Structures are given as C-alpha cells and as structure tokens.
Amino acid sequence: HEGPVANWSAVSGGRSRIGPAPPIIAIPTTAGTGSEVGGGCVIITEDGQKIVIGSPNLLPKMAICDPELTLGLPKTLTAATGMDAMAHCIEAYLTPAVNPPAAAIGLDGLERVVTYLPRAVTDGQDRDARWHMMMAASEGAMAFAKGLGCVHSMSHAIGADPDLQAHHGTLNAVLLPTVLRLNAPHVGDKYVRLRRAMGLEEGADIAEWITDFNRQL
C-alpha cells in the first residue's frame, strides 16, 4: 500500500481500505499477544508511534506455534508477554458480551498462565511451560474476539506515548488489579469462576493475588 502507515490505522478508517492479502503464515516468537490467531497487528514507527491495524483480511491462514522459538526469550519479556495473555483471558471473560465458547477458552487460558508462567520465567528452557504459555496466548486472543475492557483501554493509550517506552504487557500487569477492584461490584458471580480457574479459595481477593503474582514474576 502507498502512503504513510498511519493511513491504514484503525482510527484513520484503514480497516475499510485493507483488501485481500496473500495467505499469511504466523510464527510467534513470544507468548502473549495471540496475534497469530487474530486479524490485527501493531506497528511501531521510527518515531515511536504505535499504529494499530486491523482487518479480517489480515487473519493468518496458518499459525505455527513452536515453543522452541521462545526458549531464548528473556525473563522480563516472558513475564510481560505472559501477563498480556492473562489480561486477555480475564478481560475477555468479564466483558458483558455473551459468548460461552469464548468465555470457556479464556478461562482455560487463564488456568495455563497461572500454572505455567512462573515456570517459564524461572526456567526459560522449560519446554512444557513454554508450550502451555503459547497455547494460553492463542486462547486469550481467541477469547477477546468478544471484547476487552478498561485494562486494555488504558494500556493502549499509555503505551502509545513514545516518551514513556512502556511495554504493553507490563502496563496490563500493573493496571489489572486496580481494574478488577473497580469491576467487582458490576460483574455478578463471574469472579467465582475466575477463582476456580486460578485455583484460589472461595472469597479470595483476586486483585491482591495478581499483585503478589506480579511481584513474584
């Protein structure tokens, strides 16, 4: 396509300008965004701007999720991208849109993150943990087809500031506990299923647990 990349951004109406593309084969090298199963992408320009582009025409025809490609991912990026996957799973489940299959996929992804992200951070060569995190990332993106929430609304806005140089996953990790406390009175009994997926006791403070989880990572 001709013209500045910004012309194809979602906020500039680029979605309608993006036509059919050659078949895309996505090969992720992190476990967080889930872009390999989505029709969107983020391009960071030379001046630090983050351009969000999305279209059904960008949906990959094939995703090759090979955990071997994530074995060398540094601890900080393993943790940050993993928390991005967690935020996707939780926010997709909590959004008011009704989509039981997507909710179930998100909860399964959340269970994987809680179980395997600490292992992947502790030992980057843990292939089993890396595989489960790749699955969690893909599940998170499948689930958020039904929507996201305040965590991503804020992290995208803050992360777009080129002066901050803030990682999207790190922002999600920091914002998630506060948003969970804010949402608590408005989501009915959904936190009951969240606790079960996370292996927490009934009545446990999910926001506080995630704060501690962040510290451990």
Put a short name on every predicted segment:
Residues 32-33, 138-167:
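Glycine-rich phosphate/pyrophosphate-binding beta-alpha loops
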Residues 2-11, 162-169, 185-186:
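Phosphate-handling active-site elements
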Residues 39-146:
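Carboxylate- and glycine-rich phosphate/diphosphate-binding segment that chelates Mg2+/Mn2+
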Residues 100, 160-175:
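Gly/Ser/Thr-rich active-site loops/lids in small-molecule metabolic enzymes
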Residues 3, 93-99, 148, 181-189:
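Short helix-capping/linker segments at secondary-structure and domain boundaries
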Residues 177-217:
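Mobile late-domain/C-terminal helix-loop "cap" segments
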Residues 1-68:
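Glycine/threonine-rich beta-strand-loop-alpha-helix active-site module
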